[in-house]
Amino acid sequence: MEKLLIEGGRALNGTIRVSGAKNSAVALIPATILADTPVTIGGVPNISDVKMLGDLLEEIGGRVTYGQEEEMVVDPSNMVAMPLPNGKVKKLRASYYLMGAMLGRFKKAVIGLPGGCHLGPRPIDQHIKGFEALGAHVTNEQGAIYLRADELRGARIYLDVVSVGATINIMLAAVRAKGRTVIENAAKEPEIIDVATLLTSMGARIKGAGTDVIRIDGVDSLHGCHHTIIPDRIEAGTYMILGAASGGEVTVDNVIPQHLESVTAKLREAGVQVETNDDQITVNGDRRLKVVDIKTLVYPGFPTDLQQPFTTLLTKAHGTGVVTDTIYGARFKHIDELRRMNAQIKVEGRSAIVTGPVLLQGAKVKASDLRAGAALVIAGLMADGITEVTGLEHIDRGYENIVDKLKGLGANIWREQMTKQEIEEMKNA
C-alpha cells in the first residue's frame, strides 16, 4: 500500500488538463452490453473504477481492448447473462449500472450489491421501482439483486427523488423494451446527456435527456459506434478550487464551462478571479478570500461531489461560512481529518460551520472516500509543513494521475510505500 506525501505552502501555477468524466465512464462502459457489435469509447479516464468495469465485462464474455489516446473498445457479441453475485462487483459503487444493461439485453441479471464510497444510505429503491414498472421481477437474496423478466414493456415512471443513478439505469433497461417509456422527475446532469448520446449513436430513440422528462421509444437491437466522453466537471471543479486555495494562477484545460457555472459563481462570490473561455477556465487565487455559504443541490446546483474540497478552501476565508449537504448528509468524514490540521469546523446535522482564516498544519490524515481524499490533498497543498495522506485507493478511483498533474503545477507531492507497521496502525485506527 502507498501513502501520499505533500509539502504545502507553495503557490501553484500553470495548466492542468482534465480527463474524461468518471461519472459518465462508469455508466457508458456497462451501456456497451446493449450493443450487438463493438463500441469504441474515447477519452476514458485511467482510474481504478474503469479498469474494474472492464474486468467485469470480460467476466461475462466481452472482449475489452485499450487503444491509443485513452480509447476503450468493447466487443459485446459473445457476452452472456452470467450471474455476478460476488467479487469485483461488490467493490464498485457504479456496478449497479450492470443491472439495467444486462436486464435490457438478456432480460435477467444477478448483481452483488455495490460498494464504493460509504456515504450513508444510498438506496437503490428508485432503480428497482423502475425495473419493476418495465415488467421485471426483482428480489434481494444474500446481498445480491436478482432480476428476471419474460419481456420488458415501456412504462411511465415517476422518480420520487431525483436520482442520476436511477435515471441512467432505467434508460439502459428501457432502450430495448417494447413500446414507449417516460421517465418523469428525471435527473438533468450532463452525464445523463452523455449516456443518452452514446445510446442514440447505437440506434436508441431517446428524447429529452437533460430535462426532467425523458421519452424512450424501444428498439429491437442496438449496434456499435464511436463515442467520446465529456470532460470530468468534478475533476475540473476540484482543480479550480485548488487553484484558488494555493494562491497561484491555474488554468484548467479541457472543460465545458457551462457545466461548472455554480462553482464559478461561488468562487467569484468568495472574491476569486475566474476567467472562462471555450474550453478553459483560469482561476487566480492571490486575493483575500471572503467567506460564502454553500448548499449542495442536484444539477445545475452546487455539486455534492465538490462540497468537501470547497470546505477546505473556506478554512482560508475571512469569517464563518456554512456548508450544507442536502444530497448526502453523511458526507462529513473529512472534517475530523481537517481538524487535525488545525481547521476550525463544527458539524451540526447536515451542515459544517467553518471559521477562518486559519493556517493549516501538515499532519497524518486518512481519506475515507473519494472526494474527502481530494479535500485532504488540497488541505495538504495549503498547509505549513508535510501532510501524509493514506487511503489512496479512494483517490485513485476518481482522479487520473493526480500526482503527475499536480507536479506539473509546481506542487511538491510524491507517493511512498507504507511500512508493515504503518499499515497495521492504519487498520487499527
Curated annotation (Swiss-Prot):
Catalytic activity as recorded in UniProt: phosphoenolpyruvate + UDP-N-acetyl-alpha-D-glucosamine = UDP-N-acetyl-3-O-(1-carboxyvinyl)-alpha-D-glucosamine + phosphate
Active site (record annotation): C117 (proton donor)
Pathway: Cell wall biogenesis; peptidoglycan biosynthesis
GO biological process, one term: peptidoglycan biosynthetic process
Keywords in alphabetical order: Cell cycle, Cell division, Cell shape, Cell wall biogenesis/degradation, Cytoplasm, Peptidoglycan synthesis, Pyruvate, Transferase
Residues at which UDP-N-acetyl-alpha-D-glucosamine binds: R93, R122, P123, I124, D125, Q126, D305, I327
GO molecular function, one term: UDP-N-acetylglucosamine 1-carboxyvinyltransferase activity
A Gene Ontology cellular-component term: cytoplasm
Matches recorded under InterPro entries: Enolpyruvate_Tfrase_dom (IPR001986), Enolpyruvate_Tfrase_sf (IPR036968), MurA_subfamily (IPR050068), RNA3'P_cycl/enolpyr_Trfase_a/b (IPR013792), UDP_GlcNAc_COvinyl_MurA (IPR005750)
Binding site for phosphoenolpyruvate: K22, N23
List of residues that carry 2-(S-cysteinyl)pyruvic acid O-phosphothioketal: C117
Annotated PANTHER family: UDP-N-ACETYLGLUCOSAMINE 1-CARBOXYVINYLTRANSFERASE, UDP-N-ACETYLGLUCOSAMINE 1-CARBOXYVINYLTRANSFERASE 2
HAMAP family from the UniProt entry: MurA
Family statement: Belongs to the EPSP synthase family. MurA subfamily.
Record protein name field: UDP-N-acetylglucosamine 1-carboxyvinyltransferase 2
